[in-house]
UniProtKB/Swiss-Prot annotation:
It comes from the Eukaryota. This is UDP-glucuronosyltransferase 2B17. GO terms for molecular function: glucuronosyltransferase activity. GO terms for biological process: cellular response to ethanol; cellular response to glucocorticoid stimulus; cellular response to growth hormone stimulus; cellular response to testosterone stimulus; estrogen metabolic process; response to lipopolysaccharide. Induction: Constitutively expressed. UDP-glucuronosyltransferase (UGT) that catalyzes phase II biotransformation reactions in which lipophilic substrates are conjugated with glucuronic acid to increase the metabolite's water solubility, thereby facilitating excretion into either the urine or bile. Catalyzes the glucuronidation of endogenous steroid hormones such as androgens (epitestosterone, androsterone) and estrogens (estradiol, epiestradiol). Keywords: Endoplasmic reticulum, Glycosyltransferase, Lipid metabolism, Membrane, Signal, Steroid metabolism, Transferase, Transmembrane, Transmembrane helix. GO terms for cellular component: endoplasmic reticulum membrane. It is found in: Endoplasmic reticulum membrane. It holds the Pfam family UDPGT. InterPro entries: UDP-glycosyltransferase (IPR050271), UDP_glucos_trans (IPR002213), UDP_glycos_trans_CS (IPR035595). Residues 1-23 form the signal peptide. Its main location: endoplasmic reticulum.
């Protein structure tokens, strides 16, 4: 009987979808890791609303698993890059970024960062070439007549596929280094006087010295840093599209930019009509915990529990560091649930249980959870915001330093340095975040802000995708600045013209005064001679 009801509801949903004419075909060019987790949340909701979703999956992708998403359709195709190559590259990238990249100033880590990003650019260029050169795949996509393409611009190529298929496309994005893509292709307005550039590790109000550092970072990312190697990508895009173009120009044709952030994490800055903020779209009310885990949580009594997770991308932690962490956790009266996949530390206390996987969102939503020790990835930070849990941040790579810097500035977190952190540092941070009501108060305040939106983040994302499908784009929201070359966008031609006019007027004025002066001098001399 329940099966019949489910079938009936599905039929009703599909019939309503067809009657309203809103059902569509969505093509997806995904990125791996947490990027995929976020975009998958959107795709699952699209399927629930009756849309047909097809995900392009390069064979080199090793995290994205079609078996875990039976409602989505996958087009897997061969690539010249192997899974092992891509996996080894990302493992090395994360480890170098976590333990070797200098973070004193943007200039101190710039050579190593650029070298890592160049490797990323080359791998994705290979994947992109494998995609568009696959005639059988592209013919199949042409025949499918998709209505829209959804992509993450950090994994370039989605915009090229959309252009070849002549369909509109949207971006779902957390950030690009230094806001490079957002500024060069999206024309985002991010004044360095009060908006800390991403990867600077700064958050909130800046001192004079902070603003100097921020300006240096901005100049570096705007003029020296390259997210993608334009010398390789631009000719490739021009060749495929049959006209002179660039990667940045093609990216600039995105109908909407769905940014996986919001004003609970970010500080206010100007925004554009074709940009919307969908941070925390993956967050949900908590589900019941497994019985053994619930029993352990309940055994904590009035002290409650601490959730500890440094994510799944960091492949190594020294035994010394693991023992220091375990010692610090053993000193607090709270029970601890620690996501850890290494050798069991010798200093592990009886109050701590180690798990290879944790239902993180459900634990953070549990009434006994007192604090969250996190690597400060955007997903974990947003789950903590959603449930109003204060944080101890131990950032490692990417924008994690920026995420936790914002939370510290908003009074909902303290932060530690993974490279220099001692066991006493972690112990003191835990005592501060648990015992000082200041942090809990601010975490709850951020949670209230997050929940008090006119539309849920996931609903906003789906709305804009359906909007673009209904109207075949969103050109009326696209600022005219997208169509201007850089010198016109910054009014350099106008400034040059006005400076030239001012110079001409100044020269003419001086010449006129000199002429009049000489005329009077000559007359005076003539009168004296007479």
């Amino acid at each position: 009987m329940p099966g019949k009801w489910i079938s009936a509801l599905l039929l009703l949903q599909i019939s309503c979808c067809f009657q309203s004419g809103n059902c569509g075909k969505v093509l997806v060019w995904p990125m791996e890791f947490s990027h995929w987790m976020n975009i998958k949340t959107i795709l699952d909701e699209l399927v629930q609303r009756g849309h047909e979703v097809t995900v392009l999956k390069p064979s080199a992708y090793y995290v994205l698993d079609p078996k875990k998403s039976p409602d989505l359709k996958f087009e897997t195709f061969p690539t010249s890059v192997s899974k092992d190559e891509l996996e080894n590259y990302f493992i090395k990238l994360v480890d170098v970024w976590t333990y070797e990249l200098q973070r004193d100033t943007c200039l101190s880590y710039s050579p190593l960062l650029q070298n890592m990003i160049d490797g990323f650019s080359d791998y994705y260029l290979s994947l992109c070439k494998d995609t568009v050169s696959n005639k059988q795949l592209m013919a199949k996509l042409q025949e499918s007549k998709f209505d829209v393409l959804l992509s993450d611009p950090v994994a370039a190529c989605g915009e090229l596929i959309a252009e070849v298929l002549h369909i509109p496309f949207l971006y779902s994005l957390r950030f690009s280094p230094g806001y490079k893509i957002e500024k060069s292709s999206g024309r985002f307005i991010l004044p360095p006087s009060y908006v800390p550039v991403i990867l600077s590790g700064m958050g909130g109000p800046m001192t004079f010295i902070d603003r100097v550092k921020n300006m240096i970072c901005t100049l570096y990312f705007d003029f020296w840093f390259h997210m993608f190697n334009a010398k390789k990508w631009d000719p490739f895009y021009s060749e495929i599209l049959g006209r002179p173009t660039t990667l940045a120009e093609t990216m600039g044709k995105a109908e909407m930019w769905l940014i996986r952030s919001y004003w609970d994490l970010e500080f206010p800055h100007p925004t554009l009509p074709n940009v919307d903020y969908i941070g925390g779209l993956q967050c949900r009310p908590p589900k019941p915990l497994p019985k053994d885990m619930e029993d352990f949580v309940q055994s904590s009594g009035e002290h409650g529990v601490v959730v500890f997770s440094l994510g799944s991308m960091v492949s190594s932690m020294t035994e010394e560091k693991a023992n220091a962490i375990a010692w610090a956790l053993a000193q607090i009266p709270q029970k601890v649930l620690w996501k850890f996949d290494g050798k069991t530390p010798a200093t592990l206390g009886p109050n701590t249980r180690v798990y290879k996987w944790l239902p993180q969102n459900d634990l953070l939503g549990h009434p006994k959870t007192k604090a969250f020790v996190t690597h400060s990835g955007a997903n974990g930070v947003y789950e903590a915001i959603y449930h109003g849990i204060p944080m101890v941040g131990i950032p490692m790579f990417g924008e994690q330093h920026d995420n936790i810097a914002h939370m510290v500035a908003k009074g909902a977190a303290v932060t530690l340095n993974i490279r220099t952190m001692s066991k006493s540092d972690l112990f003191n941070a835990l005592k501060e975040i648990i015992n000082n009501p200041f942090y809990k108060k601010n975490a709850v305040w951020l949670s209230t802000i997050h929940h008090d939106q006119p539309m849920k983040p996931l609903d906003k994302a789906v709305f804009w995708i359906e909007f673009v499908m209904r109207h075949k784009g969103a050109k009326h929201l696209r600022p005219l600045g997208h169509d201007l070359p850089w010198y016109q966008y910054h009014s350099l031609d106008v400034i040059g013209f006005l400076l030239t006019c001012s110079a001409v007027i100044a020269v003419l004025t001086v010449k006129c005064f000199l002429f009049i002066y000489r005329l009077f001098v000559k007359k005076e001399k003539k009168m004296k001679n007479e």
